[in-house]
Amino acid sequence: DTDRSRGLGDVYKRQAPKLIKGEELNIIIGSRPFRDDEGSELVKLNIMLILNEKYGIVESDFISAELEAVPAFKAKDVGFDRSLVGAYGQDDRVCAYTELMAVLELNNPEKTAVAILTDKEETGSDGNTGLRSSYLRYFIADLASTFGVKGRTVLQNSRCLSADVNAAFDPTFPDVFEKRNSALLNGGVCVTKYTGSRGKSGTSDASAEFAGEIRRLLDANGVIWQTGELGKVDIGGGGTVAAYIANLDVNTIDVGVPVLSMHAPFEITAKTDIWAAYRAFEAFVNN
């Protein structure tokens, strides 16, 4: 993608929601023309040839393809002490990975453990791959039927950690945080009792009993943890998929890694917090 030179135009007069327009998010994919042909779209022809040779893609495939454009750099150590991880998409890969590893490393668990890696969270969780669909309820019902019980009985007796990040306190922008109720880098995995917009709008508010259960579990297993809200109440906020699981009558609470620069192309997390998240999920699925 490109950015306008600082000295050109009236970009500084734009309001924040219009700072970058959707139609301005154009990706640079090449500039070299195809040599052995004549025509007006030689650059396009050359790019299509490369895509075809590498991936077998032809132009009509773009109608049905799902493509993901990501920053062209690998995850990096951040800081002179290399204590941080910098990478794109840590919301929510950093929680998905730690959750998945905790489940994969289980050996003959006493209780059934399920890791749900679901889609469309950032766009509302709609569609048949989002958690607002019925696929999870049907999946649990199918599992329950093999034991001769009802799916709703299994759901009502289940517990869930919604593995999602929280915003770490950023001293560069302290005005959007309530410092006494914000997660800190290197403070451990963050337990978030509720999220929502401007308080608890559109939230899942975990019960006091379940929040206490998780607190005792983490303490008993020596997991470093903290609590935090997603910014000041009147500033905004955010949501997770916890509400959609809780709506199935499952005790659910958000647990995840604090992140600096959430949703930026280069998000930052602390390695100790990532380890604490893994330890938290490990303790949960083993108890």
Question: What is each model feature region?
Answer:
Residues 60-78:
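Acidic-glycine-rich active-site phosphate/pyrophosphate-binding loop
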Residues 86-127, 132-134, 138, 280-282:
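Alpha-helical metal-binding/catalytic segments enriched in His/Glu/Asp
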Residues 103-117, 257-287:
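His/Asp/Glu-rich mid-to-C-terminal helical/loop segments that flank catalytic regions of hydrolases
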Residues 1-8, 12:
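Single conserved hydrophobic/aromatic residue that forms the stacking wall/gate
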